[in-house]
Amino acid sequence: SLMMYGKGQKRAGAGEFALAMLSPKIKMAAGQGDLVINGVNVELKAETTQGGGRMGSGGPARNDQIKVLQKYAEHIPEIVEYFQEGVTGKSANITSFLTNFLDKYLPIGGTSPAGGNNTQIRQAIGTDIFALTFGQPYAGIMGKAFGQANANVSKNTMIAQNYEWYKAKDDFSLFVVISFKSQRLTMIKNGDEMAEAFANGMLSGGGASFIHSGQSTECFAQMNIPHA
């Protein structure tokens, strides 16, 4: 179909060639798969069936994530025991890592088995793990949110900073998610708008692995347009 035409050429994703053919004001960006619309660099994620896209590619090796946890072993022995070394293994998304592990073994306001400040340790673990994927300043902002009692705050902060990292890395001004199946389109300009799009239902998903299963791209937030 036309929406799949050109996919994979010059890093083009589904729908990008198709949209570029609709108007002389829409052009393929030179040397990459993004679009330029009226002179504005646009990053397009086109959802053609089910599933959407992720805000990034690549990601750290799982063993590098486990090594970060092991650095804090005296404070989180149960967590280190659960997440064993290996190219593949047990995983946890951000919400489950917070609610099932950190809230259980490092509750905010408490003291760790080694006498450390739980809130500070939570923030340090978050910062160090996120730094493997995003670097600074994004990882520091994400990690600081691990000191909040509400897991949704941490998730939304991660989504917003993931977007800001992605925007800086790929040098675009506007992010567009389009579903040909449901004929819906969402436009995002900044990280706060991205987080809000998930909160109000314009986008679904938002999940990202804190410790991935072996697929490093799981570390980036995923987005879908809900079907009508």
Regions found by a protein language model. Give the residues of each.
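Short, positively charged
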Residues: 1-33, 40, 44-228
